[in-house]
UniProtKB/Swiss-Prot annotation:
SUBUNIT field: Part of the 50S ribosomal subunit.
HAMAP family per record: Ribosomal_bL31_2 (MF_00502)
InterPro entries per UniProt: Ribosomal_bL28/bL31-like_sf, Ribosomal_bL31, Ribosomal_bL31_B, Ribosomal_bL31_sf
Name of this chain's protein: Large ribosomal subunit protein bL31B
BP GO terms, sorted: translation
Entry keyword set: Ribonucleoprotein, Ribosomal protein
Record-linked PROSITE patterns: RIBOSOMAL_L31 (PS01143)
Protein family: Belongs to the bacterial ribosomal protein bL31 family. Type B subfamily.
Gene3D superfamilies, per database record: Ribosomal protein L31
Annotated organism of origin: Streptococcus pyogenes serotype M1
Length: 86
């Protein structure tokens, strides 16, 4: 087998930027930032969502108000809701 074709697999700390939760895991992702975790220094990878903040794992649903195509059309052309007038 050829040598030095695979990236280095090493322990890194992932930081959930939403909740501040940190966890140690193995990864090949490189980072210039480091952090002290449990007495050791590890590379730091920032993530927007993890098991600590994902709705599937937390049981909290995050609802966003997304207008449908019809609502956007009516808003764009200034049409009122026909059902609201009745």
């Amino acid at each position: 087998m050829r040598k030095d074709i695979h990236p280095d697999y090493r322990p890194v700390v992932f930081l959930d930027t939403t909740t501040g939760y940190q966890f140690l895991s193995g990864s090949t992702k490189a980072s210039k930032e480091t952090v002290e975790f449990e007495g050791e220094t590890y590379p730091l990878i920032r993530v927007e969502i993890s098991s600590d903040s994902h709705p599937f794992y937390t049981g909290r649903q995050k609802f966003t108000q997304a207008d449908g195509r019809v609502d956007r059309f009516n808003k764009k052309y200034g049409l009122k809701d026909a059902n609201a007038a009745k």
